[in-house]
Design a protein with these regions (language model features):
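Short S/T/G/P-rich N-terminal loop/turn motif that feeds into the first structured element of a domain
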Residues: 1-50, 55-169, 173-197
Length: 197
């Protein structure tokens, strides 16, 4: 990848508190943009020398999402855990939903979290792009990842403050204008394998 100047990172996610799943792990690739994605794909299809070699596992589904980093409340890199925690929830949009408004609400939420002294996590909105069926039962997957275990624990401890803030500011009502429903959260572990970006 580096030899060819390709910008790509790969992580592995494994179920922790995710109920019954049809998979043992999820491989997650990230590119800076669509241009870099197809450049890396093309290099794999044309230049990779080990195609057909024995793999340690078989992936039965390959899909692509539009990945929008909706919020990032970062901490110093040296405080990151090697294996982090990530919560996933699939959501359905309302008929009158507005993507711009959803992003605006995310910006409001980021500011509110800063006011409440919360940090150490990021929120991504993943919208289906390639490889999905027309009857895909969700419009977006929300991922919340925590940079270390202490920040995950702090998020639980600070939830009453967040709940009160949401009530006072009508956050749930605003969110409900655009999001019809979301599934219960599923917890995965997240570990970076490599990054050439």
């Amino acid at each position: 990848l580096r030899t060819n100047g390709l910008k790509y990172s790969k992580s592995i996610f494994t179920p922790v508190l995710a109920g019954q799943t049809d998979h043992d792990y999820v491989l997650w690739g990230t590119w800076p943009d669509g241009e870099e994605m197809y450049r890396e794909y093309g290099s794999f299809l044309n230049d990779y020398k080990n195609k057909g070699s024995i793999n340690p596992g078989i992936c039965h589904t390959n899909v692509a999402f539009f990945n929008t980093a909706a919020q990032h409340l970062r901490i110093p890199l040296e405080e990151y855990d090697r294996i982090q925690m990530a919560d996933f929830s699939s959501c359905k949009f309302t008929e009158d939903s507005s993507w711009e408004e959803i992003l605006s609400l995310a910006a409001e939420s980021e500011s509110a979290n800063q006011e409440l002294g919360r940090d150490g996590f990021g929120i991504h909105y993943l919208r289906p792009y390639r490889g999905f069926n027309v009857d895909t039962p969700f419009d977006m997957v929300r991922m919340i990842h925590y940079y270390n275990k202490e920040k995950r624990a702090e998020a639980v401890a600070s939830w009453p403050k967040v709940r009160d803030y949401r009530k006072e500011n009508g956050t749930a009502e605003k969110w409900g204008q655009h999001i019809e429903s979301c599934s219960p959260m599923k917890l995965y572990s997240m570990e970076w394998i490599y990054d050439t970006r």
